């Protein structure tokens, strides 16, 4: 375990110590050492909290093999790979092991008991007992054999293992794993030919590995460990190493930080300042806070700033010592004693705080407590008091004699007596305080001087044993510290003359250690003959196995840190008890109970034999094993204790890439509490801050000088973790110098070659972006690295090094060239490092084509045809001189996924917005959002909270801060959260379980934390129990174990993945693979080589979901050449960090399960894949129907316009961002209308199409080309319509009509000039039936998307509505309205709706109506008309598009122009979102290009506006057709439904039980446009009383979001009746208009009333009824008469709606 909390403390104090590493960023290492026990625990019991978890041995072994493979692959050691499993530990360690195993057995037992008490059914198989990971058990013996098999297999089959020496020190070799590794390192260092620049990497989880690594005094030493997360909710550990984030902790930086920590000593000490000796003393100080061998000193805790205290004391006392304390592992006792004496002041300071509290306590309760406490010590302390008093008086008299004032002398004497009394009392209490500690903790009766002297000697002896163990290895196997607690610092004295001597002894045998450390609960791990010793009452050692025991936190906070109070084993008694049983051991058991040597293995091609499988049913034998062995004796690596030399590190040596140093940039350092965030929270202690020193006066900082020194050159960035990069631009915020190169060029310009550069001056926007970049970089350096970079004068833009690639010259020479990322990243100039001598070991032996493509080597084709095919190089001697290679390619059969791509929406999980769930469940959208996230409940009440503990009772299905979602339950689309039916069912179940919790949170939505007693205030209600019940239910629910994924991850759902697997299986059955022999140019071949790892094979390839790919990486978990399909894409900030989830065609060892069959999935970077589909697209020139997803930065939460999701945006009658996709097959009528509308679209696009590039969502090249093709196909330049439009005199005129004056002028002009173009437009709709039928047979082009039948119907009506809106007033206004109303059909099911050609007369009437001149007083009913110059309807161009129409209509009604934004869908479609200033938000369907999406979205917006009319009312109730998620009667109302009627005529009893308080005055219909006076009501010149008009003098409209209330049982029960009535009422809706002389009243037949009550918005009504409502000021609609329609005549409401003030629920 090492040192608790040490790793976190050290990482936060020195923020640059660790870095998160990706595989391509790992530096080169010579030696890799694995402390295996961490891996074994990780793979065998990843989640101890799950009592249902079971795992088989073969799964454990396979996972361990895979973990080892990945670690080897990540580090790629060049010389040595050392695997060390813990063997028998020294006796000093066994006590800690014993306590840990007793605790884990008891915890497991308690968890099982709790599960059984809850009624859980546990699996019948035995659970994995983690105590079996102890030397000598059957499990460890099996693992040992399997690890030997694994090493042989890898050496024989994996090229990357064949040049490395492998050491395997198993559980049979005595010693802890990490100390066996250190023994090897010490022996290597002792050799005369040792290379001081050897690069070491040690993998392990123990914090004390930092100290171990520093004892080596090696310059290049790093620690690899898994990412440790602190402070968050405990999550299940991930077994797969691919999913694991690794940290690399650099001891090179640790050494420099320690130097800074003690640099003040350079000026204070008289002897030589030696950083190596300072590091030795630093290691010694680390032991004083406790470790595996000794307990911590009293009250000295890391999280209570113990280490700064130790360091500060050292800085104070070292100048007085005359030398260092730790002399290469030997303790200098006189110096150590002086240090401890100085440190013991802490004991008194700590007690003084306690003493002050006691004095206060005494003042409250009298002297009784102190008198009793001091009783025993009073007598002993009397002499001490007298001595101290006399001494104090002498000192006082000396001082007071100097003063001649007698009065002052008397006063001083009085004060002296008071102070002396206080000091005496303090010392008495201090001694009694320590006495109580020893009596209670150590169980002694008399705390004598001999006892204290023994304590001191034991502690110092322990420190010396540990120093030997770390520096020289085990000096005594049998020594151990015999107490559970350490003595007080102030009691460790008189130690300078101690004689410390250790007897080496012998290590325990495996079974002896098992019996010494295992509890009785794990007795089955021992041979049967020993088991009775742990359980039989007559056993001579039964007292060492207590069934129950106590633990003592002893000042610690976590239970796992507590002292386990079990007796120490008496070695002699243990061995005597075992002696009587040894004769019963079986032969196999005797073999397990012995020590064995370490194995050294290496590859020998001349050695070949069959290695048998340790488990033939699971693992195959190795047919051609090429491994040689050497046995290393147990003491071969022991170094003489006096020969342990310290390596002197050459400070002027070359910089080794990947081993960071702080030396390259001038800076100063200081300690400050800056809250640097290394882990999940800001640090609370001091941070070692680094401040970069910049000479502001220097000419070097001018942008011209910076550009001339770095542009086009290689520099190192990201100080102090330097990475090489190529500079492509430099800017100072005003001017920018950049390389002017042909596309694809990535050349370094060295020497006198001047790079081709260009200078530009930045505009305001670019200058603002530059400032933001600088601010972002500065904040990152400060918040994460603790580096202050100060003022920035220049920013360098560079491409990071991704790897090296073989390039072939024209003459056939082969060079290994650096490859740079396409992505350009900004770095501030003062953090880059130039002109450093870096050591580069990546030399290549490959010089010619023959070297690069040897006979029978594997290659991949990067040209067409046969793109991505695997090939084998043949003899090319006759063609290689011509620069060609002969290859035989295998061409396998490929599955056809086109049909699946087209129909993917049928298999995708459907997600809905939160308010749809809210409607179905009968709760508010706020509750849906809150309960699917986190909800914290504290103990007690808000007024009287009980402690700081808070329980999270949220479902945890979405994580905004972490940008994570739970696939299958939640999905983030842009900035909106969507929910599946599974999430809905989970919420419904929660609502049924805890309705009172929902009710309370709905009423108190403004609070962040809720309290038990406030939610359940009743005396009989136990809030704590209720919270515990909820937590138990949540933990037991399967959703609690589901994994989260990043919202940036685009995925295909499991159902689609299953269909892909089916297609692949069908393809396999065809088996028509063929082979072809071709000669290929070498640059079109890719050969997998280790030197090329990290390089993308084909940089032009673009990756999409459904793409077919092949793995081209050798010595990888995935077999080279295996094909698969991309089923997920995880974006990242860097190109190299993008990961693809691939479903492979075959199962393979180490394969993951990613929504697919077991063992067929894996996550790979771009550099490991060749995209087969990209080759197909290149060959055919066709673009795929799925989304093009180039490796791109992860989408930030705020950039909704470029957000990527896997949802499917549908079309019409659905909520904004609804994921509904129409699946109905278009009918013949649909096609007829579609053809008409597309012909109109095509003929109207060219004039207004202006390709624009969105700032956040750049148009992809493919999309632009598609758009251009689409426009070209619309019409020919020579067509009549085109010529007519080209010469349209009104085009330029329209451009000028933007100012109010021009608008008024255009109004006059429009009344004079007739519009002849509209006649042609309407005549074009007159198409014969025969042509329609004929055209329907030809079909649509494949790239065009079919609209749903609803779209066609709505589109037709919308077309008519557009025309109607264009001319909305005439001289005889009422007659026109009546005429139009009669012409537009009411039933949406009639054939005439689609059959436009069958209504030629009607079209002409509409045309004549449209061409009538319009008067300026058309909008005289609109208020504040005098304050505005209204734009008049000007001449309509011959043919307009929906976008231009929408813009024109917005101008007509005084609204700003519509706002268009785009959403990129995962299957390559684009969706446009239209937002109007009146609050209307409309989404179009999925389209292939942005322009098409924009047009169709505008079309849908026009439908909405056309249906709404001028005074836009609220939109329709979206959820009327959704069924309730919960069956009737399951959700009780949160409040009893009140009786009575509201003043709108609604029956309260039939309404909802309001979770959110209703506002009765807000239930009225809200206008979307200018408000209209209503007779009999007070008229306000705003939307409603109390609101202010919007800018511009007229309110653009308001749409208040409605909040659904809880559905009552009664309403749910009547659901079916409402649906029946709704279905009947939608058949037909007769409408009558009033006489000209009477008020316009809409009359609805009785059959319609129930439907009307369900559809709160007029959208669902026929268009004619809206025109009637859109009356002039003189003919206003009477609200009194129409009230019965919407309120009093309906029987009941399906959904109660609260039109409160708009409040976003997400």
UniProtKB/Swiss-Prot annotation:
<dbReference type="GO" id="GO:0033574">
    <property type="term" value="P:response to testosterone"/>
</dbReference>
<dbReference type="Pfam" id="PF18129">
    <property type="entry name" value="SH3_12"/>
</dbReference>
<feature type="compositionally biased region" description="Low complexity">
    <location>
        <begin position="1647"/>
        <end position="1657"/>
    </location>
</feature>
<feature type="compositionally biased region" description="Polar residues">
    <location>
        <begin position="1658"/>
        <end position="1676"/>
    </location>
</feature>
<dbReference type="GO" id="GO:0071028">
    <property type="term" value="P:nuclear mRNA surveillance"/>
</dbReference>
<keyword id="KW-0238">DNA-binding</keyword>
<feature type="compositionally biased region" description="Basic residues">
    <location>
        <begin position="1677"/>
        <end position="1694"/>
    </location>
</feature>
<feature type="modified residue" description="Phosphoserine">
    <location>
        <position position="1348"/>
    </location>
</feature>
<dbReference type="GO" id="GO:0071044">
    <property type="term" value="P:histone mRNA catabolic process"/>
</dbReference>
<dbReference type="InterPro" id="IPR041106">
    <property type="entry name" value="XRN1_D2_D3"/>
</dbReference>
<dbReference type="GO" id="GO:0030425">
    <property type="term" value="C:dendrite"/>
</dbReference>
<dbReference type="GO" id="GO:1905795">
    <property type="term" value="P:cellular response to puromycin"/>
</dbReference>
<dbReference type="InterPro" id="IPR041412">
    <property type="entry name" value="Xrn1_helical"/>
</dbReference>
<dbReference type="GO" id="GO:0043025">
    <property type="term" value="C:neuronal cell body"/>
</dbReference>
<protein>
    <recommendedName>
        <fullName>5'-3' exoribonuclease 1</fullName>
        <ecNumber>3.1.13.-</ecNumber>
    </recommendedName>
</protein>
<keyword id="KW-0597">Phosphoprotein</keyword>
<comment type="similarity">
    <text>Belongs to the 5'-3' exonuclease family.</text>
</comment>
<keyword id="KW-0540">Nuclease</keyword>
<dbReference type="GO" id="GO:0005886">
    <property type="term" value="C:plasma membrane"/>
</dbReference>
<dbReference type="GO" id="GO:0017148">
    <property type="term" value="P:negative regulation of translation"/>
</dbReference>
<keyword id="KW-0694">RNA-binding</keyword>
<comment type="subunit">
    <text>Found in a mRNP complex with UPF1, UPF2, UPF3B and XRN1. Associates with alpha and beta tubulins. Interacts with DIS3L2. Interacts with ZC3HAV1 in an RNA-dependent manner. Interacts with ZFP36L1. Interacts with TRIM71 (via NHL repeats) in an RNA-dependent manner. Interacts with YTHDC2 (via ANK repeats). Interacts with DHX34; the interaction is RNA-independent.</text>
</comment>
<dbReference type="Pfam" id="PF03159">
    <property type="entry name" value="XRN_N"/>
</dbReference>
<comment type="function">
    <text>Major 5'-3' exoribonuclease involved in mRNA decay. Required for the 5'-3'-processing of the G4 tetraplex-containing DNA and RNA substrates. The kinetic of hydrolysis is faster for G4 RNA tetraplex than for G4 DNA tetraplex and monomeric RNA tetraplex. Binds to RNA and DNA. Plays a role in replication-dependent histone mRNA degradation. May act as a tumor suppressor protein in osteogenic sarcoma (OGS).</text>
</comment>
<keyword id="KW-0963">Cytoplasm</keyword>
<dbReference type="GO" id="GO:0071409">
    <property type="term" value="P:cellular response to cycloheximide"/>
</dbReference>
<dbReference type="GO" id="GO:0005829">
    <property type="term" value="C:cytosol"/>
</dbReference>
<dbReference type="GO" id="GO:0032211">
    <property type="term" value="P:negative regulation of telomere maintenance via telomerase"/>
</dbReference>
<dbReference type="InterPro" id="IPR016494">
    <property type="entry name" value="5_3_exoribonuclease_1"/>
</dbReference>
<dbReference type="InterPro" id="IPR041385">
    <property type="entry name" value="SH3_12"/>
</dbReference>
<keyword id="KW-0378">Hydrolase</keyword>
<dbReference type="GO" id="GO:0000956">
    <property type="term" value="P:nuclear-transcribed mRNA catabolic process"/>
</dbReference>
<dbReference type="Pfam" id="PF18332">
    <property type="entry name" value="XRN1_D1"/>
</dbReference>
<dbReference type="GO" id="GO:0016020">
    <property type="term" value="C:membrane"/>
</dbReference>
<dbReference type="InterPro" id="IPR027073">
    <property type="entry name" value="5_3_exoribonuclease"/>
</dbReference>
<dbReference type="InterPro" id="IPR047007">
    <property type="entry name" value="XRN1_D1_sf"/>
</dbReference>
<dbReference type="GO" id="GO:0016075">
    <property type="term" value="P:rRNA catabolic process"/>
</dbReference>
<dbReference type="Pfam" id="PF17846">
    <property type="entry name" value="XRN_M"/>
</dbReference>
<dbReference type="GO" id="GO:0000932">
    <property type="term" value="C:P-body"/>
</dbReference>
<keyword id="KW-0043">Tumor suppressor</keyword>
<feature type="compositionally biased region" description="Polar residues">
    <location>
        <begin position="1623"/>
        <end position="1642"/>
    </location>
</feature>
<dbReference type="InterPro" id="IPR004859">
    <property type="entry name" value="Xrn1_N"/>
</dbReference>
